[in-house]
Every structure is written in structure tokens, then in C-alpha cells.
Amino acid sequence: MYRIITEETVAGDKAVTSHYLKIIYEAIIKAGKECAFGWIDGAPKSDTLIFDECKVALKYRLRGYRNTVVWVQGIVPEEAIMKGYSRWRYYAHSIIESLVLKKCKLVIFCSQEMRKHYEKKYQLKFDKYFVMPCFNENEVDQRAFENSEKYEKNNYVYIGGLQPWQCFGETLQVYKKIEENSANPVNLYVYTAEIETAKKEIQKAKIKNFHIEYKVKEELGECLNKIKYGFVLRANVEVNRVATPTKLSNYISHGIIPIYSDCLKSFDQYNKDSNGPRIGLQCGRFGVRNERNFEIK
């Protein structure tokens, strides 16, 4: 018996996490195995437990459950440092990761770069693993190519949160240069739950033409169909080198050309291999250098 256990509580993250865990659930059912969401007291120690966090997996391992599978969404210790937490949290999370990953029956990674990161950091060799990039759309919306605004206007978009590693400030600097040098009118659309924070940053950057809204997943697709270019800029740090940002699937599904940093290694390599259309900005090479190794000419 397989059991999927999550303790995610943040609304936005919970929705995305549920999407991925549902895919794992359906794969197990299609394989002819029994699977259920959630925990029940007295579950046999022989059950295989699937987690989306190492710290949760460790709790159950300490209770005697040895058949564990972990889906690793991000490198938590390094993310903690980027969020400004103390070094002790980094070391605590690293110890948890090391203990859990060494004993897992299977590890699900977001990218091959993430697997390489863990193998190097903890001197591990994963024999049983699976790579499932982060995404929330897996088919092309043909309506996007029938939207005249996509071809007639130069609309740019940024979607998602404003965490430090998402480089929203640097994105605005790049867009400002585009706005100043474009021979034709340009528009920036920002879809985020952090509307007031985004508005302050945009006004600080003195962007002229912009629109800020929050859209749920079901509404976002229609809004993206009119967009031509989408930003996914990242600082050249390990958190980003192992990442496969969800917004890339949104962009590709709606015919949007990604403007992305080449430090998103897995996506960059895939795009090169498939000869896909791209505007790749080399980290550290795109005149105003800041503390996160960006240059914006």
C-alpha cells in the first residue's frame, strides 16, 4: 500500500503541490497498485510512504517507517539562507536532508541538476530516482495563436511570487531598458498575489505602461494568450541552477517566448537540444552590476 503524505499549509504552494502529488497518485494507480492520500493511525510499517518534504519524512522514519519516497521540490537549506534565516537553520535542514535522502527507496527530483547537487553535497549516488520538472500546464492552448494582440503588440509578462531569488527587481530593470529603447509601444503585465509590493517596485523603477492583477490558475491562461514575451530571470546561485520554474510551462503552453537566464541549466540545455525559440540572458552579462551578479546593459 502506498500513502501520500503532505503537511503543506501555504495556500498557493498547496495548490501547486497538490497538482504534482495527484500525478504521482495517478501513476501508482495506473501501475495497478493501491494508493491513498493522508495518514491513518496504525498503518502497517510495510506501507510505502510518499512525502513532499524531507523534514516530514524524517518524522515518520523515526516512528519506524522505512519504505519512504521523497519528492524534492527545492534545495531547502540554500533557500533558507536566501530568505535571510540564520546559518543554524541551513545546517539543521542539511542534516535532515542527508539522513532522509541516504535511506529513501526512491527520490523524485525537479531536474538532473538537482540530482547532481545532492550527489556532490552529500557524496551520494542515487541508483533509484526519477526526474519530474515543475509544471502546471502540459498542453498547448491553440487559442493563443489565434489572438491577434499577440502579434500586433509587444506585450511582456511576469507571473509568480516576489521572493528574492525570483529577481523581480532585476526583471523591472531589464524591462525598463526595453521600454526606453523600443521603437514601438510596449506593455508589462504582472500577475502576482503580492499586488501592493509589486506596484511599489514598478513605480520605483519608473515603468510607464503596466498592469498588475492576481488571477487564479483557471483565469490566467486567457490572460496569457495575448502575451509575446515572458520573463524568467534568475541570479546565478545554486537555488536557481537546480530549478525548473513552474512559470516556464505557463509560457510555453501559451506560445510565449521566454526571456530567461542561462543559469536555469536544465531548461537551457533542453531548449538548446530541441532548437527551441529563446532569448537567453547570460548571468552576469545582461552594464548596472548589483550584489546578485547581474549586469543590465
Give the residues covered by each predicted segment.
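Nucleotide-activated donor-binding/catalytic signature segment of Leloir-type glycosyltransferases, i.e.
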Residues: T192, A198-Y229
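Nucleotide-sugar-dependent
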Residues: Q166, K217-C223, K228-S253, I259-Y270
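Conserved donor-binding/catalytic core segment of Leloir-type glycosyltransferases
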Residues: N147-Q166, T171-Y175, L188-Y189
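Glycosyltransferase donor-sugar binding loop
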Residues: I159, V186-K199
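Donor nucleotide-sugar binding/catalytic pocket of nucleotide-sugar-dependent glycosyltransferases
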Residues: K102-K120, L124-R143
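Membrane-proximal helix-turn-helix segments that form the acceptor-binding/catalytic region
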Residues: V76, R87-F109
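Active-site proximal beta-strand in glycosyltransferases
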Residues: T48-I50, R63-I81
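Acidic anion/phosphate-binding donor-loop and adjacent secondary structure
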Residues: A80-I81, F130-K153, C167
